[in-house]
Amino acid sequence: VRGLTGDALGIDGYTATGVTVTVRAKHVIAAGGAINTPALLLRSRVPDPHGRIGLRTFIHPVNLTIAEMPEKVDPYYGAPQSIASDYFQWRDGATGPMGYKLEVPPMFPGISSGVFNALGDDLRRQMAALPHTNAMLALLRDGFVPESPGGRVRIADDGSPVLDYDVSDYVWDGVRRAYLSMAEAQFAAGAKRVRPAHLDGQDYTSWTQAREAIGQLPLKKFRALLFTAHLMGGCGMSDDPKRGVVNSAGRHHQLENLSVFDGSVFPTSIGANPQLSVFALTAQNVSALSRSIKP
């Protein structure tokens, strides 16, 4: 890498100023995350003899269920997502059916009004019941079997990054089992009614009713509501250049003075909120890099 050239943007982060900036350095670190780092390398035409840049981008597909509890739970107060369960995460091994981590997210009014998937009087009723509302979500760990290859980052005609992510039958099976696990847990906790976040989902008033109905829900795009908050992969690490963009130290296989230090180097998803893992891996690799570069 001989240098970096970029267009300076205005204070809003979007408007071009017409100013071009070139930076030269002994070593360059890309740390744009699982979408922007692959996009940067693709736009820069970084050597990619094995076509790995942008592949195996993982998102932890998320689905959720919403319950009305008899007592107030005030889901918008307190430390968010402080309760979680890994019971279903590795129960069948890494290569068995898709595992998932269960979490209890906060339910702020703005977010809630969107996930309730309701209008008019129905939405008013559900918002009025928000103090009694509990939500559970499942982080489905993608990337551990061939049936779950993740997505691919590519560059649109205007130069912006696009993520293509196909939801396979393997993932849909995990979505259905997660719906069932969450609904069962909510009824066990005393829920008056439970509804999956699905356009065909209804309020179910018993576990028996929910189990039968969820088993019949059509699982396909634009019917089941899927979310993500975690982006990983796209510049996966492997000490085999045919399988990774960088090695396990984050060093690029083809360009000796380029490193990638962010979540894009994950070779799979990790089945957990990745913030601390990104911090730890980056701290390890940047420390090793600093020792290897002579002043």
Features from the language model and the residues they span:
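Surface-exposed helix-capping loop/turn segments at secondary-structure junctions
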Residues: V46, E184-A197, S292-P295
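Cytochrome P450 core scaffold surrounding the K-helix E-X-X-R motif
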Residues: A39, E147-G150, V246, S269-I270
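Secondary-structure capping and boundary motifs in well-ordered enzyme cores
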Residues: G32-G33, G174, A229, A249-H252, ...
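A conserved FAD-binding loop/helix module that cradles the flavin
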Residues: P267-S287
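Glycine-rich loop(s) and the adjacent beta-strand/alpha-helix scaffold that form part
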Residues: V1-G3, I11-Q81, D262, L281, ...
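FAD cofactor-binding and catalytic pocket of flavoenzymes
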Residues: H50-L180, E184, F222, T228-L231, ...
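Non-transmembrane alpha-helical segments in soluble domains
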Residues: L41, R176-Y179, A183-F187, V286, ...
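A glycine-rich dinucleotide-binding beta-alpha-beta segment and adjacent secondary-structure elements
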Residues: V1-G10, A191-T268
